[in-house]
Amino acid sequence: MTASQPLDQADQDSESSSAGSSAAETEHVSVMPNEIVQWVREINPTTIIDGTYGGGGHTRLLAEVLADAGSDSDTPRVIAIDRDPAVVRRDEQKSWIKDDPRIELFLGSYESSPKALDALDLTHADALVLDLGLSSDQLADRNRGFTFTIDDAELDLRFDPENGVPAHRWLQQHSEKEIADAIYRFGEERFSRRIAKQIFLRARERNPVTKVGELVEICRRCVPRSRNHDIHPATRTFQALRIAVNDELGGLTRTLQSAPDWIAPGGRVAVISFHSLEDRIVKNAFREDHRWEILTKKPLRPTDEEVQANPRSRSAKLRVAKRVE
């Protein structure tokens, strides 16, 4: 079953993009699926929120967890949420979703989980699962700018291309200092000021950065290859702009702060993060709120076998906490 109405209404200026019209379907492999199933199944859940639907891999597995739970509830559910309207439009008519009354697909951010619960006349969920990585669909979409390989792609970087401000416009709306600070804070890029200066110089010359290749070339010139020989010189800058444009860290922080209000006592939150900024927020949120009991003293990592089969999982970290009764 699907929900056609979006959970969120944009409060900021929006700029539509053709990227929102379709979503290419690629072979997306969910990260740490066995671990997610293990930690969620143990509580025999009746309502699970998959806050990052993506390719639907975790949602399918979580639906089977519901089936295994043997609940007395008449309406066990997996509430799947995704920010990308193209993904929701693509998948809402798939038979495994449309014909399964246990699955509800919503358009919105995981920060709007309480709205999804309210739409179904529910007050609490038993589990929340978040996989904070980029999906294969997003990486494959040439209109998004998530990959460095398409030089003429628009520098967009939005998860929801129908709302908010694309990265190239964000750059034009901020000062050189604000750009440098964002690249340093969200990308931990040591050469952020060099990069910001070049971006700002182009804007002053009325030749602003609008394409992926233009920003990649600036990063190549500003980041000494010997300093970051293990990663592409543009990696940290693109990460920083993506985080800024989508308010990723703010949304994660607010969600974990509010989650104890709508996760049932005894329920669990499982978060898969992919870089230190996200992981730090998750760790501190679980540690600082007495309503959480940390179940993973150290973050769990994917097995060697999974990394070999799915290289994008190599940097994943899973933390799980229980809502104290």
UniProtKB/Swiss-Prot annotation:
It comes from the Bacteria. It catalyses: cytidine(1402) in 16S rRNA + S-adenosyl-L-methionine = N(4)-methylcytidine(1402) in 16S rRNA + S-adenosyl-L-homocysteine + H(+). It holds the Pfam family Methyltransf_5. Residues 314-325 have a biased composition (Basic residues). GO terms for biological process: rRNA base methylation. SUPFAM superfamilies: Putative methyltransferase TM0872, insert domain, S-adenosyl-L-methionine-dependent methyltransferases. GO terms for molecular function: rRNA (cytosine-N4-)-methyltransferase activity. Residues 1-28, 303-325 are annotated as: Disordered. Specifically methylates the N4 position of cytidine in position 1402 (C1402) of 16S rRNA. NCBIfam families: 16S rRNA (cytosine(1402)-N(4))-methyltransferase RsmH (TIGR00006). This is Ribosomal RNA small subunit methyltransferase H. It comes from Rhodopirellula baltica (strain DSM 10527 / NCIMB 13988 / SH1). The gene is rsmH.
